[in-house]
Amino acid sequence: MLKDLNKVRNIGIMAHIDAGKTTTTERILFYTGINRKVGETHDGASTTDWMEQEKERGITITSAAVTCFWNGNQVNIIDTPGHVDFTVEVERSLRVLDGAVAVFDGKEGVEPQSEQVWRQAAKYDVPRICFVNKMDKLGADFYFTVQTIIDRLGAKPLVMQLPIGAEDDFDGVVDLLEMKAITWRGKVETGAEPVIEEIPADLADKAAEYREKLVETVAESDEALMEKYFGGEELTIEELKAGIRKLTVNSEVYPVLCGTAYRNKGVQPLLDAVIDYLPTPLDIGEVHGHKVGDETVDLVRKPSVDEPFSALAFKIAAHPFFGKLTFVRVYSGIVEPGAQVANSTKGKNERIGKLFQMHANKENPVDEARAGNIYAFIGLKDTTTGDTLCDKNDQIILESMDFPDPVIKVSIEPKTKSDQEKLGTAIQKLSEEDPTFTVELDEESGQTVIGGMGELHLDVLVDRMKREFKVEANVGNPQVAYRETIRKPVEKLEYTHKKQTGGSGQFAKVIIGIEPYAPEAETLEEGESATYKFENAVTGGRVPKEYIPSVDAGIQDAMQYGYLAGFPLVNIKATLIDGAYHEVDSSEMAFKLAGSQALKEAVAKAKPVLLEPLMAVEVITPEEYMGDVIGDINSRRGQVSAMDDRAGAKVVKAKVPLSEMFGYVGDLRSRTQGRANYTMIFDSYAEVPTNVAAEIVAERNGTA
């Protein structure tokens, strides 16, 4: 464990599903493994040996974090999946990363999932370097990929290397800083060292042109360097590296490297770039949180062992021997096995059993967890993803993570009584691991309904129930997570809750107004909801202040069950305008019931409508099927928003209701003889057309 945080990097490797992220990660673990076993000669262990070893110790590659070492530096790699249904995994990794490597397919350039992951990284302000992978692939084009980084991501790439050759003739890269060629010629064994050569004559002019751009970008970012550069002096390699590092850490530029991880070309320079340009925990600096019980009091923790202990749990994983592993990023302070800490999010104390760092092929017990690093804790009982762990005597709640609500649900029915019990265990374990996996009981049918981010997400969860927990169950058809909202304001609605029959009565009178509510995300304070707002406009104590939260709670209760078909209500602002109370008969419960009923009656008058999830769909198809594909999208109530060319194929972008996309994968295959593919990402909620809404409401209310 390195104590010097200047030598620590917490990074993630992020990519579209087939860009080669796993191979890149494996090669990084391989090369850093060699680096760790100093003194052992490398005996040409082939990729397959490594892969078998990977399979045997499957826990680490699938684990949330692996620690490895490179040239005296420690690199903690946090794994992120590439499939859109698992965006929550990406979201939670990015929350605890300091930097990331974005891997792009050298033929496809920036793909839809790359765009989404890039946007998520921008949300958490994570500095990135880019690796254009698969340069050996037929049709690979480095310059096209760099252009897509500009066009599709709106980012400023800083080209650090140029490829030497392409496809089968890809032999290495030109290093634009050192102005040397780094080559791996012919078939390269895993672990082979590159050869440093002169730049090939046919690339000399291009290399000079790109180096000039690079030097100019760095010089323009610093006055002293600018004077030196425009005064005709050369900038030193050290000055250039320091300038690039500063620009990268500030997310002003994104260094671009290239290679082919599968063919073992370009990985070592990528690791060098991770160390040279991505930030340390010290570069990231202090983290912000708030006081327990008062979100308005801002607290900070510096990345130092001298500060009080604070950490964020970012993933829970099951382990065959240790039960539950809780992966945490320690932001400040130091903690030892056996210590009692506070879970300030839950208001409970936890005792830490063992502490591990996950190394490339084993769990490594450590005797302390220090600021700036990533660990697995064992023995925590109540901690879930997004919880803060901290010093019991100096508590803080760190900013948590936002998890999207599920967009798709299925009912699941165990086949036997023993399956029923196993299902309970499976659901508990899986929902601990995955915050976007939800479970509810359908009161009408008595069925268990599970929710997730897409068909694949639920397939994987159901499959895990069968494999890991031996649950045999029947799975129903997918259901869409509809919502309800209102289209017009209701200025005043009066409701009196009255029950005065013997003994203590109940009395509460409220006058509320409601209106549609759709704030801009940027205007929201931390912790504020984007779908509901409550305002108290009562004056003169006509409703005592201790009853105001009860009215709010009653309104929120009523929003769980909408007017049209019982779907949750969203995007409503409710204002408590006036009311009345009784000295003896008023209570919190009376005002809660009054708030609840008032909302129900107000919604009925506010032109309620049904909302459905819209998906952003991108179909890549050969040109001859394009008409068919577009016609099919239109028949699914989709709206085509753009058409592009990409790598010899056509790209159709559209917004389509999720309810119309079930089974699309099979339809698309048969329509295009298996030659088209698509990606689908949740986009937004939109109003359901009246005729379709009428059918959904009738079916839901049993009047169809």
Curated annotation (Swiss-Prot):
Main location: cytoplasm
Pfam families membership: EFG_C, EFG_III, EFG_IV, GTP_EFTU, GTP_EFTU_D2
Domain of life: Bacteria
Entries under NCBIfam families matching the protein: EF-G, PRK12740.1-5, small_GTP
Function description: Catalyzes the GTP-dependent ribosomal translocation step during translation elongation. During this step, the ribosome changes from the pre-translocational (PRE) to the post-translocational (POST) state as the newly formed A-site-bound peptidyl-tRNA and P-site-bound deacylated tRNA move to the P and E sites, respectively. Catalyzes the coordinated movement of the two tRNA molecules, the mRNA and conformational changes in the ribosome.
Recorded family membership: Belongs to the TRAFAC class translation factor GTPase superfamily. Classic translation factor GTPase family. EF-G/EF-2 subfamily.
This protein's name: Elongation factor G
